[in-house]
Amino acid sequence: SEAAASDLHLGYDLNTGENYYGPYYDDWSEKTDDELYEEALTEDTTINVYATSSKMMKVEESFEETYPGLDLVVFDLDNDEVLSKAKIEHDTGNITADVLQTKDVNGNVFHEWYNQDILEPYFPKDICSHIDEENLKYGYPLYASQSMWFYNTAAFPDGQPIHSWWEIIEKKDDGTQKYHLFTKEIGQESAYLSLFASFINNADEMAQSYKDTYGKDLEYTYDASDFNFEVPEKNAGVEYLWRFSQAEMTFIGDGDELVLAVHNSTADEPALCLASAGKIGNRDESGYNIAWCLNLEPYTALLNLESLFIAKGTNSPAGARLFVRYITGGADGQSEGMKPFKKEGNWPVRDDVEDKKNPAQLSELGARANDLSAIYAIYPDVQDMWTYWLSKNPKMK
């Protein structure tokens, strides 16, 4: 229907095949905290939040103190549950959720969920003026996180031993691998696979980074005829995927155990691991000798953004938006609501909020915004390539 098509303000329009990107501003975007609070008191005063981060629980008390008369209820769910519960509520017309927290790392949520009439975008204009436009493209962000390569600081007292992604899989003169590699199974971890997909989309940069690292052109050794879909020829990102899939790796599902493996490694038997940046917490909590590898060429990581939405059909439309503003810092970036999300390995995306927790600021990481549409287009193929090539790896049998 015509009306439905033009109602979509963010996401993939099934009728026209068009993508609509943020930020999208409407009347709500202009309203202040005070205006929203006043309005919130006249509607259903219980605000239900479907959160994917248990840290959201820590906001209940301070929010209710700041805004007397409003009652905040937080449900701690996983990402798929947030979406599936919201869908059931929408389909039955029995809408409980008011605010939804989602995370999209491969474009699936943007392309397949935004257009189901379940999520309503909300971009508060004053706050968005402090956020990079590329971080508003796929939703309104709560904070950024990412995966990082960790190294052992005792084994490498002079600093990180690698400066490019190619060096991670480097071989010694005798053909053996330079580093022991610990990671989650890439093919089952959509955030990691998306990162590898981005290298295929940015193949020119991968080729250049190889040349910068080794002073010669990359040789292509993968066989594009392995698949019944079109694999690009002479693509440095595909070459990287192929070489990485043939490396010797140890898959560990738990992030704390991944960084422990690096902590236990030595200068003679050096190790690297790919884990979520927040695992750096083990350095202070458990005394691990670990640090992040920063500014890897061509880029360190993709920024994965936690996004906030209003549930379509909510009976607390003002209260829901007031809460979204509150946990993203409020008008001045000073609200208590942001505090639980400030930890090492989480980065605020506002330029007017001081980030004291992180050893490196967002601008210093060498990470980049995640282009979800480009990743979504090739993600299934990349998954097939990884899975098939990994199955052919003699070291991983």
Locations of the language-model features?
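Periplasmic-binding protein-like
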Residues: 129-133, 144-148, 240-244, 287-312
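Sec-exported extracytoplasmic/periplasmic mature domains
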Residues: 41-45, 64-69, 87, 91, ...
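Paired acidic/hydrophobic, glycine-rich loop segments that form the ligand-binding mouth/hinge
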Residues: 94-101, 251-252, 268-276, 291-293
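A ligand-binding cleft/hinge motif common to bilobed small-molecule-binding domains
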Residues: 106-112, 263, 270-291
